[in-house]
Structures are given as C-alpha cells and as structure tokens.
From Swiss-Prot:
It comes from Synechococcus sp. (strain JA-3-3Ab) (Cyanobacteria bacterium Yellowstone A-Prime). Keywords: Calvin cycle, Carbohydrate metabolism, Hydrolase, Manganese, Metal-binding. Its EC number is 3.1.3.11, 3.1.3.37. It is an enzyme of class 3 (hydrolase). One of its GO terms (molecular function) is metal ion binding. InterPro entries: FBPase_class-2/SBPase (IPR004464). The lineage of its organism: Bacteria, Bacillati, Cyanobacteriota, Cyanophyceae, Synechococcales. Pathway: Carbohydrate biosynthesis; Calvin cycle. PANTHER family: FRUCTOSE-1,6-BISPHOSPHATASE 1 CLASS 2-RELATED, FRUCTOSE-1,6-BISPHOSPHATASE CLASS 2. This is D-fructose 1,6-bisphosphatase class 2/sedoheptulose 1,7-bisphosphatase. Mn(2+) 1 binds at D33, E57.
Length: 347
C-alpha cells in the first residue's frame, strides 16, 4: 500500500470523530453515529484508492452509508485507470467503526473512538455480525495465554510476564449478564475488574500498551469489532484471540439470534468450516500490510477526546502500521475556514 495512504486515513478518522463529538452528551446515539458515518464516507471517497468495506454499518439494505461490500475511493470510478496510479488501483479491504461506543458519546462518557483498519484484499476476515469471545493481552504474554485456559491461569501467566502479582492486574470486561461467572472467576483469582458498557476496541488497545493500567480484555463482544481489535494488536505485537459465539443461550443479549444450526450453516457458506475455531490475530488480520487508525471522540486511556475552541477543534489520533512497524500519536489542530483562532495552546 502507498505510504501516502497512511496520512490520508488519519483525516478520515479525525473528521468522523469531530462530527460525532458535536453530539457528545446530547443523548442521541443514533445521530452521533449517523454524522460520523457520513463524515467518514465523504472523506474516504476523496482518497485516491480502490477500497471495499468488509466490516461496516450492516448490509446494503440495512444501512445507506458504509454498508458491507460498498466501494469507496476515487479509484473505484469506471474511468479510474485514466487518472489513478498503478499502486492506487490495488484493491484494499477496509473495516470501519465510525463511532465505536455510540452510547458513550450520547452520555458524555469516556472511551469512544472513530476507528478504521485497512489491508490488501483478503487481508481482513469478513466477520459475520454475530458475537466473539475475546482475549487481549500485552505483548509480553503473546502466545502464552489462551482462550481455552481458565481466567485464573491466564491471569497468572500475564502477571508473570509483566513481573508483577495477579492482584496488580486490571481486566476489562463488558458489563453484561453473560459475564457474571467470568467476573467472579477474575475476582477470585485476585485481579481487579473494570466494567465497561461499550467500546471494547478501546479496551483491547489499552491492553496492548504499557502504562494504561489495563492488562487484559476478556469476555464476549461483537465479532466485527474483534477483527478490528486484532488488526491493531497484530501491528503492536500484542496478543489477541477470538472465537465466534452464536448460541443465544451463551450470548444472553436480549436480541434475536438465529438457531444454532442455521448460523453454523451460514458460517460454512461463508467459508468458515470450523465455527468453533480459536482465531489468532494473525488469522483475523492476515494481510501482509495492515494499517490501523483511531481518533478519540471522548477521552480514553490512550487519547484525549475532541476538544473544541473558538475557530476550530483539536484531535488526538493513534496510527499503527505493520509495514513500517511504527506507532504514531498525532496531535492535530483543525482551524475553520476563514477563521483565525485567537491563540493556540501548546498542550
């Protein structure tokens, strides 16, 4: 992929975050999501690339913007060969979550981000819109912990990898009825639990960095977000595993899920022969080149949220590349057209 693309996708997540942040604390999660989607789509279509949404806002019939299978980018036009360079015509798979944690934005709570991951065609698993059991852990524990291990064993491994006690660890778990037993096991092992209502991509990311105070993510969340998390943690060299969960009795989400056998059949039709397989992050995000970007909408462990001032806004963005093996934190001041801010604060 073109190195220039890494700079251009920064603007994609920045604009989505700014749009959503205008609705922070207003109690309207649907509008926050809608404006983020619209801003992200508009920016994607200004980039000289040939992109295809593989994880997005639903199917074509369910979502007018950024639906699965939608083509984005200038080079998707029929006459693209006339003005796009050869490298810009290479097909790219894109996974997006324009407003991860819409409820967090609506309530003015921490942990919401605008997120995007890209790879060459076939480089990201086309995860179905079901659930996934997830395990994220620091790079020091990569390949040592496992989804099939009980929480107590994984916590002991993580503690030893980080040269600390289990009681020093904090594990993020989504606050769901299905996690009652998991939470009990973590606490009985001696670790602390941080419950979140939404936003497990942010939590998985935090587990991949030292100094966030988060040492693992455990539990069941959405499968598409699992692929995006895997893309980020693969670039970081951290640990991520996922297993698709499709049994309504396990999920306990209160939303409709098809009968188990029907889902198993659909997964096989999509090429997933073993629906109970434990996926490594290198399988979920298998591309030779993987790029991840996220801009904070509200404050989080890694990035501050969007801050507005007279004449503009300020954003913090995280960009991780498997190709260049870089992690960049980008602090950007956005000035409104025709307006000059009275002052620019250094921090």
């Amino acid at each position: 992929m073109d190195n220039k693309l890494g700079l251009e996708i920064i603007e994609v997540v920045e604009q989505a975050a700014i749009a959503a942040a205008r609705w922070m604390g207003k109690g309207d999660n649907k509008t926050a999501d809608q404006v983020a989607v619209e801003a992200m789509r508009e920016k994607l279509n200004q980039i000289p690339m040939r992109g295809r949404i593989v994880i997005g806002e639903g199917t074509r019939d369910e979502a007018p913007m950024l639906y699965i299978g939608e083509e984005v980018g200038i080079c998707t036009r029929p006459d693209a060969e006339q003005f796009c360079r050869v490298e810009e015509l290479v097909e790219i798979d894109i996974a997006v979550d324009p407003c991860e944690g819409t409820n967090l934005v609506a309530k003015g709570q921490n942990g919401s981000m605008a997120v995007l991951a890209i790879s060459e065609k076939g480089g990201l698993l086309h995860a179905p819109d079901i659930y996934m059991q997830k395990l994220a852990a620091p790079p020091q524990a990569k390949g040592k912990v496992h989804l099939d291990y009980p929480p107590e064993k994984n916590l002991q491994i993580i503690a030893e990898s980080l040269d600390r006690e289990v009681s020093d660890l904090t594990v993020v778990v989504m606050d769901r009825k299905r996690h009652v037993d998991l939470i009990r096991q973590i606490r009985e092992a001696g670790a602390r639990v941080k419950l979140i209502t939404d936003g497990d991509i942010s939590a998985a990311l935090s587990a991949g960095f030292n100094g966030t105070g988060i040492h693992a993510l455990m539990g069941i969340g959405a499968a598409p977000e699992g692929v995006i998390s895997a893309a980020a943690l693969r670039c970081l060299g951290a640990h991520f595993q996922g297993r698709l969960i499709y049994d309504p009795e396990v999920v306990q989400a209160g939303t409709y899920l098809p009968p188990v056998e029907e889902t198993r059949r659909q997964l096989k039709e999509q090429g997933i022969e073993d629906p109970d397989k434990v996926w490594e992050c290198e399988e979920l995000a298998s591309g030779k080149e993987v790029l991840f970007a996220a801009t904070g909408i509200t404050d989080g462990d890694l990035m501050r949220g969007v801050r507005f001032f007279g004449g503009g806004a300020r954003t913090e963005t995280l960009v991780i590349s498997s190709q260049s093996r870089t992690v960049r934190f980008v602090d950007t001041i956005h000035m409104k057209d025709g307006q000059q801010p009275r002052s620019l604060q250094l921090r």
